[in-house]
Amino acid sequence: MITITNLNKHFGAVQAVRDLSLSIPAGELFCFLGPNGAGKTTTIKMLTGLLRPDSGTIKIGDFNIQSHPVEAKRIMGYIPDMPFLYEKLTPVEFLKFVAGLYNLNRPDLNAHIEASLRQFDLQGARNALIGELSHGMRQRLLYISTFIHDPKVILIDEPLIGLDPHSIRMIKDLLRAKVKDGMTILLTTHILALAEDIADRIGIISGGKLIALGKLNELQTQSGSNGTLEDIFLKLTSTP
Protein backbone atom coordinates (compact mmCIF):
# COMPACT_ATOMS: atom_id res chain seq x y z
CA MET A 1 0.00 0.00 0.00
CA ILE A 2 2.97 2.36 0.53
CA THR A 3 5.91 2.17 -1.87
CA ILE A 4 8.86 4.54 -1.49
CA THR A 5 11.62 4.39 -4.09
CA ASN A 6 14.98 6.20 -3.95
CA LEU A 7 13.59 9.18 -2.02
CA ASN A 8 15.85 12.18 -1.40
CA LYS A 9 15.25 15.57 0.22
CA HIS A 10 17.61 18.47 0.91
CA PHE A 11 17.13 21.63 2.94
CA GLY A 12 19.94 23.81 1.67
CA ALA A 13 23.19 21.96 2.27
CA VAL A 14 21.56 19.49 4.67
CA GLN A 15 20.31 16.20 3.24
CA ALA A 16 17.33 15.27 5.40
CA VAL A 17 16.44 12.02 3.59
CA ARG A 18 18.98 9.90 1.72
CA ASP A 19 18.00 7.45 -1.01
CA LEU A 20 15.15 5.95 1.04
CA SER A 21 13.39 2.90 -0.38
CA LEU A 22 10.68 1.07 1.56
CA SER A 23 7.59 -1.02 0.88
CA ILE A 24 4.79 -1.40 3.44
CA PRO A 25 2.04 -3.89 2.50
CA ALA A 26 -1.65 -3.71 3.29
CA GLY A 27 -2.51 -4.73 6.84
CA GLU A 28 0.84 -3.82 8.40
CA LEU A 29 1.64 -1.46 11.26
CA PHE A 30 5.08 -0.04 10.55
CA CYS A 31 7.01 2.07 13.08
CA PHE A 32 9.69 4.55 12.06
CA LEU A 33 12.25 5.17 14.81
CA GLY A 34 15.10 7.63 14.85
CA PRO A 35 16.77 10.39 16.86
CA ASN A 36 15.69 14.02 16.53
CA GLY A 37 16.46 15.34 13.07
CA ALA A 38 16.80 11.85 11.59
CA GLY A 39 14.30 12.48 8.78
CA LYS A 40 11.15 10.84 10.14
CA THR A 41 8.84 13.85 9.97
CA THR A 42 10.30 14.97 6.64
CA THR A 43 9.52 11.54 5.21
CA ILE A 44 5.94 11.61 6.48
CA LYS A 45 5.40 15.09 5.06
CA MET A 46 6.60 13.88 1.66
CA LEU A 47 4.25 10.91 1.89
CA THR A 48 1.32 13.27 2.50
CA GLY A 49 2.33 15.62 -0.30
CA LEU A 50 3.10 18.50 2.07
CA LEU A 51 6.74 18.41 0.97
CA ARG A 52 8.02 17.65 -2.50
CA PRO A 53 11.01 15.29 -2.75
CA ASP A 54 14.09 16.33 -4.70
CA SER A 55 14.06 12.92 -6.36
CA GLY A 56 12.41 9.54 -6.00
CA THR A 57 8.80 8.37 -6.06
CA ILE A 58 6.03 7.69 -3.56
CA LYS A 59 2.95 5.57 -4.24
CA ILE A 60 -0.04 5.34 -1.91
CA GLY A 61 -1.93 2.32 -3.15
CA ASP A 62 -1.91 2.64 -6.93
CA PHE A 63 -1.45 6.42 -6.93
CA ASN A 64 1.74 8.47 -7.23
CA ILE A 65 1.46 11.24 -4.63
CA GLN A 66 3.01 13.76 -7.05
CA SER A 67 1.13 12.96 -10.25
CA HIS A 68 -2.19 11.90 -8.64
CA PRO A 69 -2.33 13.75 -5.29
CA VAL A 70 -6.12 13.96 -5.05
CA GLU A 71 -6.60 10.24 -5.60
CA ALA A 72 -3.79 9.37 -3.17
CA LYS A 73 -5.11 11.67 -0.43
CA ARG A 74 -8.62 10.29 -0.84
CA ILE A 75 -7.46 6.93 0.53
CA MET A 76 -5.14 8.40 3.16
CA GLY A 77 -5.44 9.87 6.64
CA TYR A 78 -2.78 11.97 8.39
CA ILE A 79 -2.28 12.81 12.06
CA PRO A 80 0.55 15.36 12.49
CA ASP A 81 2.56 15.90 15.64
CA MET A 82 1.17 19.45 15.99
CA PRO A 83 -2.40 19.30 14.65
CA PHE A 84 -4.64 22.27 13.92
CA LEU A 85 -8.30 22.13 14.89
CA TYR A 86 -10.98 24.79 14.42
CA GLU A 87 -11.43 26.00 17.98
CA LYS A 88 -14.72 27.82 17.35
CA LEU A 89 -16.48 24.65 16.18
CA THR A 90 -17.96 21.91 18.33
CA PRO A 91 -16.75 18.32 17.84
CA VAL A 92 -19.94 17.45 15.95
CA GLU A 93 -19.61 20.50 13.68
CA PHE A 94 -15.94 19.74 13.05
CA LEU A 95 -16.59 16.10 12.15
CA LYS A 96 -19.38 17.09 9.76
CA PHE A 97 -17.01 19.65 8.22
CA VAL A 98 -14.34 16.98 7.67
CA ALA A 99 -16.94 14.61 6.23
CA GLY A 100 -17.90 17.35 3.78
CA LEU A 101 -14.29 17.72 2.65
CA TYR A 102 -14.36 14.07 1.61
CA ASN A 103 -17.84 14.41 0.05
CA LEU A 104 -19.20 11.74 2.37
CA ASN A 105 -22.88 11.20 1.71
CA ARG A 106 -23.40 8.15 3.89
CA PRO A 107 -26.98 8.14 5.23
CA ASP A 108 -25.78 7.02 8.65
CA LEU A 109 -23.24 9.86 9.04
CA ASN A 110 -24.91 11.35 12.13
CA ALA A 111 -25.18 7.95 13.80
CA HIS A 112 -21.57 7.18 12.84
CA ILE A 113 -20.37 10.42 14.41
CA GLU A 114 -22.30 9.77 17.62
CA ALA A 115 -20.95 6.22 17.84
CA SER A 116 -17.40 7.47 17.32
CA LEU A 117 -17.80 10.12 20.02
CA ARG A 118 -18.99 7.43 22.43
CA GLN A 119 -16.11 5.12 21.47
CA PHE A 120 -13.59 7.87 22.23
CA ASP A 121 -15.41 9.00 25.39
CA LEU A 122 -16.24 12.42 23.92
CA GLN A 123 -20.03 12.25 23.90
CA GLY A 124 -20.20 14.58 26.91
CA ALA A 125 -18.26 17.23 24.98
CA ARG A 126 -20.16 16.91 21.70
CA ASN A 127 -21.52 20.48 21.90
CA ALA A 128 -18.57 22.16 23.62
CA LEU A 129 -16.23 24.40 21.64
CA ILE A 130 -13.04 22.61 20.60
CA GLY A 131 -11.07 25.50 22.08
CA GLU A 132 -12.41 24.51 25.51
CA LEU A 133 -11.29 20.87 25.25
CA SER A 134 -8.18 19.44 26.91
CA HIS A 135 -5.21 18.40 24.79
CA GLY A 136 -6.06 14.73 25.19
CA MET A 137 -9.66 15.30 24.12
CA ARG A 138 -8.50 17.19 21.05
CA GLN A 139 -6.18 14.34 20.14
CA ARG A 140 -9.02 11.84 20.41
CA LEU A 141 -11.20 14.06 18.24
CA LEU A 142 -8.42 14.20 15.68
CA TYR A 143 -8.35 10.40 15.50
CA ILE A 144 -12.11 10.32 14.88
CA SER A 145 -11.78 12.86 12.07
CA THR A 146 -8.89 10.96 10.49
CA PHE A 147 -10.83 7.69 10.36
CA ILE A 148 -14.15 9.22 9.29
CA HIS A 149 -13.70 8.44 5.56
CA ASP A 150 -12.42 4.89 6.16
CA PRO A 151 -8.94 5.45 4.68
CA LYS A 152 -6.79 2.55 3.54
CA VAL A 153 -3.57 4.18 4.75
CA ILE A 154 -2.91 6.19 7.93
CA LEU A 155 0.24 8.23 8.59
CA ILE A 156 0.81 9.28 12.20
CA ASP A 157 3.60 11.50 13.51
CA GLU A 158 4.07 10.81 17.24
CA PRO A 159 0.67 9.22 18.05
CA LEU A 160 0.69 9.44 21.85
CA ILE A 161 1.76 13.03 22.55
CA GLY A 162 -0.07 14.40 25.59
CA LEU A 163 -2.36 11.39 26.08
CA ASP A 164 -3.20 9.89 29.47
CA PRO A 165 -2.78 6.12 30.09
CA HIS A 166 -6.47 5.42 29.36
CA SER A 167 -6.29 7.21 26.01
CA ILE A 168 -2.98 5.54 25.16
CA ARG A 169 -4.49 2.10 25.67
CA MET A 170 -7.52 3.10 23.62
CA ILE A 171 -5.36 4.31 20.72
CA LYS A 172 -3.10 1.25 20.77
CA ASP A 173 -6.09 -1.11 20.70
CA LEU A 174 -7.70 0.94 17.93
CA LEU A 175 -4.60 0.89 15.72
CA ARG A 176 -4.16 -2.87 16.08
CA ALA A 177 -7.85 -3.42 15.30
CA LYS A 178 -7.62 -1.24 12.18
CA VAL A 179 -4.57 -3.15 10.96
CA LYS A 180 -6.35 -6.45 11.57
CA ASP A 181 -9.10 -5.16 9.28
CA GLY A 182 -6.55 -4.51 6.52
CA MET A 183 -5.54 -0.89 7.08
CA THR A 184 -1.90 0.11 6.56
CA ILE A 185 -0.42 2.33 9.28
CA LEU A 186 2.94 4.07 9.30
CA LEU A 187 3.81 5.93 12.47
CA THR A 188 6.84 7.68 13.87
CA THR A 189 7.58 7.62 17.56
CA HIS A 190 10.26 8.29 20.15
CA ILE A 191 8.62 5.77 22.48
CA LEU A 192 10.56 2.56 21.88
CA ALA A 193 8.22 0.53 24.09
CA LEU A 194 5.30 1.51 21.85
CA ALA A 195 7.10 0.30 18.74
CA GLU A 196 8.13 -2.93 20.44
CA ASP A 197 4.55 -3.47 21.63
CA ILE A 198 2.48 -2.84 18.51
CA ALA A 199 4.66 -2.79 15.39
CA ASP A 200 4.70 -5.57 12.82
CA ARG A 201 7.99 -4.20 11.51
CA ILE A 202 10.32 -1.42 12.57
CA GLY A 203 12.57 0.82 10.54
CA ILE A 204 15.39 2.77 12.16
CA ILE A 205 16.48 5.94 10.39
CA SER A 206 19.53 8.03 11.24
CA GLY A 207 21.03 10.92 9.32
CA GLY A 208 18.25 10.57 6.77
CA LYS A 209 19.24 7.01 5.92
CA LEU A 210 17.39 3.78 6.71
CA ILE A 211 19.97 1.81 8.69
CA ALA A 212 17.91 -1.17 9.92
CA LEU A 213 14.61 -2.77 8.96
CA GLY A 214 12.59 -5.75 10.15
CA LYS A 215 11.00 -7.51 13.08
CA LEU A 216 12.76 -7.39 16.46
CA ASN A 217 14.66 -10.64 15.89
CA GLU A 218 15.78 -9.38 12.47
CA LEU A 219 16.97 -6.11 14.00
CA GLN A 220 18.92 -8.11 16.57
CA THR A 221 20.67 -9.98 13.77
CA GLN A 222 21.38 -6.81 11.79
CA SER A 223 22.80 -5.01 14.82
CA GLY A 224 24.71 -7.96 16.26
CA SER A 225 22.85 -7.51 19.54
CA ASN A 226 20.52 -9.86 21.38
CA GLY A 227 19.27 -7.04 23.58
CA THR A 228 16.06 -5.05 23.72
CA LEU A 229 14.90 -2.62 21.06
CA GLU A 230 16.38 0.14 23.20
CA ASP A 231 19.77 -1.59 23.16
CA ILE A 232 19.58 -2.03 19.39
CA PHE A 233 18.47 1.55 18.80
CA LEU A 234 21.23 3.05 20.94
CA LYS A 235 23.88 0.86 19.34
CA LEU A 236 22.85 1.73 15.79
CA THR A 237 22.28 5.46 16.28
CA SER A 238 25.10 6.36 18.66
CA THR A 239 27.73 8.67 17.22
CA PRO A 240 31.05 6.79 16.85
Model-found features: residue ranges?
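Helical segment within the ABC ATPase nucleotide-binding domain
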Residues: 168-181
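Conserved ABC ATPase "signature" region
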Residues: 96, 100, 107-125
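Catalytic Walker B motif of ABC-type/P-loop ATPase nucleotide-binding domains
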Residues: 154-158
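ABC ATPase "signature
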Residues: 213-214
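Conserved ABC ATPase signature
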Residues: 129-136
